[in-house]
Amino acid sequence: MFLDFDNCLHRCDAYVSGQDVVASEPGVALFEFAAILERELQPYPDVGIVLSTDWVGVLGFEGARDALPLASLRERVIGATRIDDCDEPASSELTHGEQIRRYVAKHRLRAWLAIDDRRDGFEPFPEQLVHCQRGVGLGDSDVQKMLARRLRLVFYVKTNWD
């Protein structure tokens, strides 16, 4: 599962102010929708998170991972697209979709989803994108339903008891 933060786990962008990362909108709590993601991922313990957020470029991998407020989400983080592309000098200029497609190809992933507020770069894989609208994020009940449905389609493993 590739994860963008801004306009996904909270309903606005964020920026660095001094030593802190703050929401661009007054009154918005960063990671306000983290518990929703935690709830939706709960039935899928083997699904890891790859950070596809610009926070990695600003705070580094550990800083971005550790910014996640829930231990259950931090423990799922297995990598970041920007780290994986660090040998590519222009990788920071690629869209999230392009970074993710490179990661998928390099690691030969067969099953994946991405939560992002941008569609660019995902054109070849529209079914893998859980698109969050800017200003709403995972707070949108329709997006939550889409996420639940796509998680089932992509990661559900049938057992002998089903």
Task: Please describe what each predicted stretch is.
Residues 3, 52-58, 115-117:
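Short His-Asn-centered micro-motif
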Residues 62, 66-162:
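C-terminal cap/substrate-recognition subdomain and adjoining C-terminal extension
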